[in-house]
Amino acid sequence: MLPSWKAFKAHNILRILTRFQSTKIPDAVIGIDLGTTNSAVAIMEGKVPRIIENAEGSRTTPSVVAFTKDGERLVGEPAKRQSVINSENTLFATKRLIGRRFEDAEVQRDINQVPFKIVKHSNGDAWVEARNRTYSPAQIGGFILNKMKETAEAYLAKSVKNAVVTVPAYFNDAQRQATKDAGQIIGLNVLRVVNEPTAAALAYGLDKSEPKVIAVFDLGGGTFDISILDIDNGIFEVKSTNGDTHLGGEDFDIYLLQEIISHFKKETGIDLSNDRMAVQRIREAAEKAKIELSSTLSTEINLPFITADAAGPKHIRMPFSRVQLENITAPLIDRTVDPVKKALKDARITASDISDVLLVGGMSRMPKVADTVKKLFGKDASKAVNPDEAVALGAAIQAAVLSGEVTDVLLLDVTPLSLGIETLGGVFTKLIPRNSTIPNKKSQIFSTAASGQTSVEVKVFQGERELVKDNKLIGNFTLAGIPPAPKGTPQIEVTFDIDANGIINVSAKDLASHKDSSITVAGASGLSDTEIDRMVNEAERYKNQDRARRNAIETANKADQLANDTENSIKEFEGKLDKTDSQRLKDQISSLRELVSRSQAGDEVNDDDVGTKIDNLRTSSMKLFEQLYKNSDNPETKNGRENK
């Protein structure tokens, strides 16, 4: 069906306005998928977005941060590799905590499912603890973003300051603001926060010119989103979105983990649930088995020496089938059905109106998930996008739009939840309904509830229930200085203004006195400017530590190479060297190796001292072997030796 002239005209006017009003960014802008389980970074090269491989050569990076006993911070694959022996200080899936209160039901569930500590910060937020220090989830996210930033900088061979970062479509305001804070902590300017399904749609539809209605089913490591979009000649308009910010691969891992622990307890009578190292080994085996069962019908979970009792060591050897996995995780898969139906209803379409269904996120590879999607939409999902990379590629496209590299794409996203204020009797009065296109601005006139009232408290809520007690408080402020008047007389204009990131600004103005007040909502909690400044400084300190650590490793490598080369040369010319000179070199080699060994063991060793010993050994060896070379070429010396 062709779009109406009215819609066509509105779209084109909006497109022109957006282009003229947008500020182009002259520097490189990267696209980052900050995932619960894995993260990725991409850049636009010409007309094509490209994933950038990390230092380990991988296209995705585990969203894992660890702190070692030596005070070193590890990010990505190195952090994940040591998680079994350092589980309580290895932080993963912290995106599930970002922007959340400690008392939230989702947080309370997670506390018993992870080996590290989740603690209550002074502002009521959920933070994490490692090595007796606390970190906000935004700070941990910042460490992962920094890894992505460094990956891009190594590829581009220049500094990167700007990025587009993706978030789950169903993230609330506090979670979006916390994601921006994560970038600020490491000195990365997050120009735009883009919804993950929308980014995936960009990756899919960049080269599509024909009109389409698509559904993006995004089941990742920690969150589930479903979005319905209209794509028409470069315009990507989100019609509706729904989801669950606490449903993903981590939950599937937990279900399988619990099944393995239960099976082992039945067989041996031993409960492993309080053995952190064993639980971490089982968690990794569960994830591996889950992935394998997407491409094979059965596997074996094999964990030797998982524990021991008086009778000796115990092992886990457990055959496991795809059918078993599907039965265990059926309740999780079923939780995706209702959001899909709601999204279709909100978009005012039926499943038959959908042209293509995109599967995004690692969990969408599970055959049972694909079967569920097929039943919901009556068609097989499209294979046009890589589930692990589509979001980062879409972020890179939006980054290119902001930098001016791409000019024929317009993204019209929506707010996932309704926004409004508390009115008399605890009623939730909506100003902006869910699935409203953003940016968006809406004003409404309210009045006082009591005679003589000189101030009003504006409480801002997000949600879909009729009463505020059932919705989420995301901010509040007071408008004072209202002239006393009978109740219902003052005219107070409340305005909601949502930017393209989904960040909300709320203002209230007394139309008689022109007094006004406003708030940029960062949630009922969130990081203060002071906390962000402290974290920025900490990030810089870690940056210096990381640089120092790298320098120390490079210096140690140089020392080891020189010591080996010199040692080999001494052996080669043993009979021709003066014994005193030879012993002096050997002593210098021993002294250098001892210093390097102390440095690698974590002792306070000055790199300059190591460098000095390297220079001294190099100078001594060069002088000695130069003299040896001269002697070997001197006829008199040669003859003298022959005549003796």
Curated annotation (Swiss-Prot):
Q: Which UniProt keywords apply?
A: ATP-binding, Chaperone, Mitochondrion, Mitochondrion nucleoid, Nucleotide-binding, Transit peptide
What taxonomic lineage is listed for the species of origin? Eukaryota, Fungi, Dikarya, Ascomycota, Saccharomycotina
Q: What is the documented function of this protein?
A: Plays a role in facilitating the assembly of some protein complexes inside the mitochondria. It may initiate the events that lead to refolding of imported precursors in the matrix space.
**Entry keyword Cell cycle:** no
Name the predominant localization. mitochondrion
Q: Name one GO molecular function term.
A: unfolded protein binding
GO biological process per UniProt: chaperone cofactor-dependent protein refolding; iron-sulfur cluster assembly; protein refolding; protein targeting to mitochondrion
Q: Which InterPro entries match?
A: ATPase_NBD, Chaperone_DnaK, Heat_shock_70_CS, HSP70_C_sf, HSP70_peptide-bd_sf, Hsp_70_fam
Listed Pfam families:
HSP70
Which SUPFAM superfamilies does this entry report, sorted A to Z?
A: Actin-like ATPase domain, Heat shock protein 70kD (HSP70), C-terminal subdomain, Heat shock protein 70kD (HSP70), peptide-binding domain
GO cellular component entries: cytoplasm; mitochondrial nucleoid; mitochondrion
Kindly list the places in or outside the cell where this protein is found, as annotated in its UniProt entry.
Answer: Mitochondrion matrix, Mitochondrion nucleoid
Q: What CDD domains does UniProt report for this protein, alphabetically?
A: ASKHA_NBD_HSP70_Ssc1_3 (cd11734)
The name under which this protein is listed is Heat shock protein SSC3, mitochondrial
Q: What domain of life does the UniProt record list for this protein's source?
A: Eukaryota
